A protein has these predicted regions:
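Membrane-interface junctions at transmembrane-helix termini in multi-pass inner-membrane proteins
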Residues: 137-159, 371-401, 411
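Membrane-interface helix-loop junctions in multi-pass transport and translocation proteins
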Residues: 154, 165-204, 393, 403-417
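Interfacial/gating helices of multi-pass transporter permease domains
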Residues: 35-56, 185, 189-190, 233-238, ...
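Helix-loop junctions and terminal segments of transmembrane helices
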Residues: 63-78, 292-316
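Interfacial transmembrane-helix starts/ends
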Residues: 11, 48, 81-98, 232, ...
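Interfacial segments at transmembrane-helix termini and the short loops linking adjacent helices
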Residues: 112-130, 275, 341-373
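Hydrophobic alpha-helical transmembrane bundles that constitute the permease/transmembrane domains
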Residues: 18-30, 56, 60-68, 101-105, ...
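N-terminal membrane topogenesis motif
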Residues: 1-27, 83, 87, 224-249
Length: 417
């Protein structure tokens, strides 16, 4: 491990990722606001439907493995077992590639069937264009898991900003261009997705360049390594509970969309009206996710930090890291929660461009979602702490039960407006 990597402690890693997240969120707003203005709530709804399906496959492919990879590399690095670091990377890469190819094939080949299942048949172009991203994200995750396991957050941070800038430029140009030349909102939504695919490709190329240098510089050690099967088993033991929970929540989100759209259509709304209402809901969800994204750097940083401290039997250091993470989470989430709840109307008017009835609906949604930010932040950080301690099963069960409760609420409340 280089001197630069050794100097990156938990707080430095968190700060790097937080700065990258701030830039990514600003760029993301510059991407989604004009995108919503150009392709409308209908097109934005297709865009988000594609993302919901993509997220399910992404969770299956990458939710647990990067965490498992980060933990195992952190353990091996803290003990100076760099041959084992190489072994963990090699095994994880093989698993990632198999999952990525399968996910990309499913989204690309069966895009029309997936769109029909979601009660939005016109979303097929967006779903198909997003298919290659599953493989690209899997490739990127192998590199990010390697760096995060060594406590080096710089490549991940830079790649996130690079990804956001590319998505902004390519996505807006492609969406506006296709809308102008074809007049088709579904194709314009697909064009917006092309920006995501291009950004993933460029980010993967950058991470590969960083990885080659870092991997080549790993010290040569003489310790033995575990077999391919043993290493794969170790990864799976950590990854499967996390993957099941994350994928389960994304599947529940997909079912929520299907249920929501089915209920609206059953109440007599036209397809275009239902798509518009879902688009407004998706935009408020995007705003809700902005503050929560600043908690993610904390969760990414504390897993390898706590794992390394526990490996060296430094319980006091692990506890201090956990307390620091909790304090930072509170400082970020509480002002954001109250701010968005109180200023729901001007925020949705500015970021969503809504007026009239659309603004009234968005304001009501944003007020409720605003207060939920605090609870979501606590869930994210406590889940990461438990994962670092090797106790991933309990938060998975709790989140799954919460998802079922949400599904029941959507069914009851949407059917009785």
């Amino acid at each position: 491990m280089s001197d630069t990597q050794k100097q990156q402690n938990f707080l430095q890693g968190t700060a790097l990722l937080a700065m990258a997240t701030a830039n990514v969120k600003v760029i993301g707003a510059l991407y989604k606001i004009p995108l919503n203005a150009n392709i409308g709530e209908q097109g934005f709804s297709y865009f988000n439907t594609a993302y919901e399906i993509y997220n399910v496959l992404l969770m299956v492919s990458t939710a647990g493995l990067p965490v498992a990879m980060s933990r195992m590399i952190s353990q091996a690095s803290s003990l100076g077992h760099y041959n084992q670091v190489r072994r963990v990377y090699s095994v994880a890469r093989t698993i990632f590639l198999a999952l990525g190819i399968s996910g990309s094939f499913l989204m690309t080949v069966f895009c029309r069937q997936l769109a029909a299942f979601q009660e939005q048949p016109d979303a097929w172009a967006a779903i198909g264009c997003l298919g290659p991203c599953v493989l690209l994200i899997c490739i990127m995750s192998t590199f990010r898991g390697f760096f995060q396991g060594q406590g080096n957050m710089l490549p991940t941070s830079i790649s996130q900003v690079l990804e956001a800038v590319t998505k902004l430029i390519v996505g807006i140009v492609a969406a506006v261009g296709l809308l102008k030349f074809t007049g088709s909102i579904p194709l314009a939504a697909g064009g917006a997705i092309l920006g995501v695919t291009a950004s993933c490709l460029l980010s993967a190329i950058y991470l590969f360049g960083c990885f080659r240098r870092s991997f080549r510089d790993l010290p040569i050690t003489d310790e033995g390594v575990t077999s391919f099967g043993q290493t794969a088993k170790g990864l799976m033991v950590i990854a499967i509970p996390i993957t099941v929970g994350s994928a389960g929540l994304q599947i529940l989100t997909m079912l929520e969309t299907k249920l929501y759209m089915g209920q609206l259509l059953g109440l007599g709304y036209l397809q275009a009206e239902a798509d518009t209402m879902k688009g407004i809901y998706n935009m408020t969800q995007t705003i809700f996710n902005m503050p929560c994204a600043f908690i993610t750097p904390i969760t990414i940083s504390i897993i390898p930090a706590i794992t390394a401290q526990l490996t060296l039997c430094n319980d006091k250091g692990a506890r201090e890291t956990e307390e620091s993470a909790a304090r930072i989470t509170g400082l970020i989430s509480m002002p954001c929660a109250f701010g968005l709840a109180v200023l729901a109307e001007p925020v949705t008017a500015l970021l969503g461009g809504y007026t009239g009835e659309k603004l009234a609906l968005a304001t009501r949604l944003m007020t409720v979602l605003g207060f939920a930010i605090m609870f979501n932040a606590v869930v994210l950080v406590t889940t990461a702490i438990m994962q670092a301690h090797g106790r991933a099963g309990r938060p998975v069960l709790i989140m799954f039960l919460g998802g079922l409760l949400k599904l029941a609420a959507v069914y009851i409340l949407t059917g009785n407006p």
